[in-house]
């Protein structure tokens, strides 16, 4: 397992990177927290959330290692009876996954992003009594440290 300091650094870098997605339907993608400010007129929110920590997948004889950071992007909307809004949520998250394949994050000195890729297609994973629904896409970042 990667050190907590390394994971914190990766999480911060990934959040900055996710917020460069040009087609995000919100002003800011947040970390591990979805809030909708009805008073401000917000009707959607997005968050990056880590999944089960970061794993070292390979150690190199000459030093350094390769690791995998698993995360998901969550999109919360209130679609009402609109199937079109639901489909648009999936489409936007799948588009994020496509964008992520070609846009490597800057992870700082000594850490090199190898690839970012979705591990699933977007899907709905929660519905709430107040009418909001959460959609998610699961992803992973492969990176090298001190190589």
State where each predicted segment sits.
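Beta-rich nucleic-acid/ligand-interaction surfaces
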Residues: 35-43
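A short, hydrophobic beta-strand-centered structural micro-motif
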Residues: 43-50
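Charged, amphipathic alpha-helical segments and their flanking helix caps
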Residues: 1-36, 52-147
């Amino acid at each position: 397992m990667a050190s907590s300091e390394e994971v914190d650094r990766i999480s911060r870098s990934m959040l900055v990177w996710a917020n460069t997605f040009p087609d995000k339907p919100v002003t800011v993608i947040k970390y591990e927290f979805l809030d909708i400010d009805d008073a401000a007129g917000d009707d959607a929110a997005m968050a990056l959330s880590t999944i089960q920590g970061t794993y070292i997948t390979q150690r190199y004889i000459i030093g350094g290692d390769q690791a995998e950071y698993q995360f998901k992007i969550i999109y919360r909307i209130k679609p009402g009876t609109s199937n079109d809004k639901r489909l648009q949520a999936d489409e936007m998250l799948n588009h994020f996954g496509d964008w992520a394949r070609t846009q490597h994050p800057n992870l700082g000195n000594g850490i090199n992003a190898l690839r970012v890729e979705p591990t699933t297609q977007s899907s709905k994973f929660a519905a709430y009594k107040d009418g909001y629904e959460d959609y998610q896409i699961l992803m992973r970042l492969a990176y090298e440290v001190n190589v």
